[in-house]
């Protein structure tokens, strides 16, 4: 993630962490911001050409950390943004299972983009949508293994609410994923 400041009245002194929501290019960095309050709600009103200051990147949510040919990406809610960004960075020879968890279908904000990436991947990216409650779709070792049979032999990347990140961490530990193959970008300023 990066810390962002926007040079506009009411925003300049505020610094907020946002993850990239698409792979970076030479000309563009993209963020997707969920309306969670005054600051995030006001971002939509920024004028084109507004000067932006950013600091980072922070965390270890990069494809360079992967060492396996199987990758499990898990995104919950707005945590899908860095997951979506990293999904397009892996090249040929890497099999990706991506789990996108949301309470309702309306919250699957990047579904169209993920469907497109999966379609153009020639089968190397499989996207699994889990829509509903935690009780309907628990993030435990058995349920994840049903979706991603190579879970135990995968590099695991997860971003989302703290409870979901911890549930996936516990499941990964149960199936034998070592700490160095578990990468998270949790909401807030901690990284492991």
What are the language-model segments listed below?
Residues 1-53, 95, 101-104, 115, ...:
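Ferredoxin-reductase
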Residues 28-33, 38-40, 104-158, 171:
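C-terminal helical cap/extension that packs against the catalytic core
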Residues 53, 126-130, 183-185:
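General small-molecule cofactor/ligand-binding pocket signal
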Residues 57-67:
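A short, basic/flexible loop-to-alpha-helix module at the beginning of a structural domain
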Residues 70, 94-97, 124-126, 155, ...:
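Residues at the starts of beta-strands that form the adenosine-phosphate
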Residues 79, 161:
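Short, conserved phosphate/pyrophosphate- and ester-handling motifs at nucleotide-, phospho-/glycolipid
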Residues 80-91:
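Histidine-anchored nucleotide/phosphate-binding helix
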Residues 175-192:
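Short, flexible loop segments at boundaries between secondary-structure elements
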């Amino acid at each position: 993630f990066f810390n962002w400041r926007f040079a506009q009245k009411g925003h300049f002194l505020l610094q907020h962490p946002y993850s990239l929501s698409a792979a970076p290019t030479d000309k563009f960095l993209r963020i997707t911001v969920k309306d969670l309050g005054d600051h995030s709600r006001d971002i939509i009103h920024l004028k084109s050409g507004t000067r932006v200051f950013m600091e980072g990147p922070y965390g270890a949510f990069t494809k360079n950390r992967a060492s396996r040919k199987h990758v499990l990406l898990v995104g919950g809610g707005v945590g899908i943004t860095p997951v979506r960004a990293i999904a397009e960075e892996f090249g040929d020879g890497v099999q990706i299972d991506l789990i996108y968890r949301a309470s309702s279908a309306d919250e699957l904000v990047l579904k169209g983009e993920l469907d497109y990436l999966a379609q153009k991947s020639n089968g190397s990216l499989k996207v699994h949508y889990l829509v509903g409650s935690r009780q309907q779709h628990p993030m435990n070792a058995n349920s994840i293994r049903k979706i991603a049979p190579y879970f135990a032999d995968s590099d695991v990347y997860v971003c989302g609410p703290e409870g979901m990140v911890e549930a996936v961490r516990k499941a990964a530990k149960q199936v034998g994923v070592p700490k160095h193959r578990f990468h998270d970008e949790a909401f807030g300023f901690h990284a492991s």
